[in-house]
Amino acid sequence: MNLRDNLRRLLVRFYARRVEGHLDHDQVPKHIGVIMDGNRRWAKAAGSTTAQGHRAGADKIEEFLGWCSETDVGVVTLWLLSTDNFDRPQEELGPLLGIIEGVVRTLAADGRWRVHHVGTPDILPSQMQNALKEAEETTAHVDGILVNVAIGYGGRQEIADAVRSMLLDAHEKGTSIPDLADAVDVDLIGKHLYTGAQPDPDLVIRTSGEQRLSGFMLWQTAHSEYYFCEVFWPAFRKVDFLRALRDYAARHRRYGN
C-alpha cells in the first residue's frame, strides 16, 4: 500500500468520525433493511471468482452489524438469498448456499445477535433448514440486535404465505368465511407476515447503485425511506453507513401524508 492510499484511508476515517460525532441518536432508524447487492460485480472488478465475491460479501456482515450496535439500531433485516436466486446456475448456487449457511452459523455462534429467519424454509436444503432452526433456538434469549436473515425470500411470496397462514388459523379456530372477511384488515395480515409483530423498516439501504427494491419487504416498506449507495456490498464502509444514517436523519418522514 502506497502513501496516497494510506492518506486516503486516514482522511476517510477522520471524516467518518466527524459524521458520527454529529449524529443524533434519537434520529437513528430502529429497523434497517439491507439489500446487499454487488458481490459478483465486485468480484469481476477485482479479478476474483464469483464465489470469492460472495465470500467477501459474507465477511462484511458482522462488521456491518457491529456498526449497527454502535449506533443503537434495534432490528436489521439482511437479504441474503431471494427466491429468484434459485434460478442461478448450480455451479454458483451450490457454493453460495454453503457460504450463507456459514453466515447463519457464525452469527449464532457469535452470541451478540438474535437470529430470525424470514423466507420460505421448504425451498431450502435440509442442511440450511437445520442451521436456521438451530440459530433461532440458540439465540432466542440473546439481548442484542434482532437480525432477520432473509433466505429463500420473496416479497410477493411472503404476502401469499401470510394470507395462507391467516386462512389456516381461521379454519383451526372455526371462523366462518363471512366472519373472517369482516375481520380482515392490514393489522391482521401484518401479524401473519414473516416479521410478525416487529416494527417495519425505517430505512432500506441498497448497495451497488441499483435503484429498485426487487420485491424486498413489499408490505413492510410502505412508509420506509430508501438510500441507494453506489458502492458494491463487499466494499461498503462505515463511512457509507454513517452517510446513510445522516441522510435518513435529515429527511422529513411523511407516512403518506
Curated annotation (Swiss-Prot):
<dbReference type="GO" id="GO:0045547">
    <property type="term" value="F:ditrans,polycis-polyprenyl diphosphate synthase [(2E,6E)-farnesyl diphosphate specific] activity"/>
</dbReference>
<feature type="binding site">
    <location>
        <position position="37"/>
    </location>
    <ligand>
        <name>Mg(2+)</name>
    </ligand>
</feature>
<feature type="binding site">
    <location>
        <position position="42"/>
    </location>
    <ligand>
        <name>substrate</name>
    </ligand>
</feature>
<dbReference type="GO" id="GO:0016094">
    <property type="term" value="P:polyprenol biosynthetic process"/>
</dbReference>
<feature type="binding site">
    <location>
        <begin position="82"/>
        <end position="84"/>
    </location>
    <ligand>
        <name>substrate</name>
    </ligand>
</feature>
<feature type="binding site">
    <location>
        <position position="225"/>
    </location>
    <ligand>
        <name>Mg(2+)</name>
    </ligand>
</feature>
<feature type="binding site">
    <location>
        <begin position="212"/>
        <end position="214"/>
    </location>
    <ligand>
        <name>substrate</name>
    </ligand>
</feature>
<dbReference type="InterPro" id="IPR036424">
    <property type="entry name" value="UPP_synth-like_sf"/>
</dbReference>
<dbReference type="InterPro" id="IPR001441">
    <property type="entry name" value="UPP_synth-like"/>
</dbReference>
<protein>
    <recommendedName>
        <fullName>Isoprenyl transferase 1</fullName>
        <ecNumber>2.5.1.-</ecNumber>
    </recommendedName>
</protein>
<comment type="function">
    <text>Catalyzes the condensation of isopentenyl diphosphate (IPP) with allylic pyrophosphates generating different type of terpenoids.</text>
</comment>
<comment type="subunit">
    <text>Homodimer.</text>
</comment>
<dbReference type="Pfam" id="PF01255">
    <property type="entry name" value="Prenyltransf"/>
</dbReference>
<feature type="binding site">
    <location>
        <position position="86"/>
    </location>
    <ligand>
        <name>substrate</name>
    </ligand>
</feature>
<keyword id="KW-0479">Metal-binding</keyword>
<feature type="binding site">
    <location>
        <position position="206"/>
    </location>
    <ligand>
        <name>substrate</name>
    </ligand>
</feature>
<dbReference type="GO" id="GO:0000287">
    <property type="term" value="F:magnesium ion binding"/>
</dbReference>
<feature type="active site">
    <location>
        <position position="37"/>
    </location>
</feature>
<feature type="active site" description="Proton acceptor">
    <location>
        <position position="85"/>
    </location>
</feature>
<dbReference type="InterPro" id="IPR018520">
    <property type="entry name" value="UPP_synth-like_CS"/>
</dbReference>
<feature type="binding site">
    <location>
        <position position="54"/>
    </location>
    <ligand>
        <name>substrate</name>
    </ligand>
</feature>
<dbReference type="GO" id="GO:0033850">
    <property type="term" value="F:Z-farnesyl diphosphate synthase activity"/>
</dbReference>
<keyword id="KW-0460">Magnesium</keyword>
<feature type="binding site">
    <location>
        <begin position="38"/>
        <end position="41"/>
    </location>
    <ligand>
        <name>substrate</name>
    </ligand>
</feature>
<keyword id="KW-0808">Transferase</keyword>
<feature type="binding site">
    <location>
        <position position="88"/>
    </location>
    <ligand>
        <name>substrate</name>
    </ligand>
</feature>
<comment type="similarity">
    <text>Belongs to the UPP synthase family.</text>
</comment>
<dbReference type="GO" id="GO:0005886">
    <property type="term" value="C:plasma membrane"/>
</dbReference>
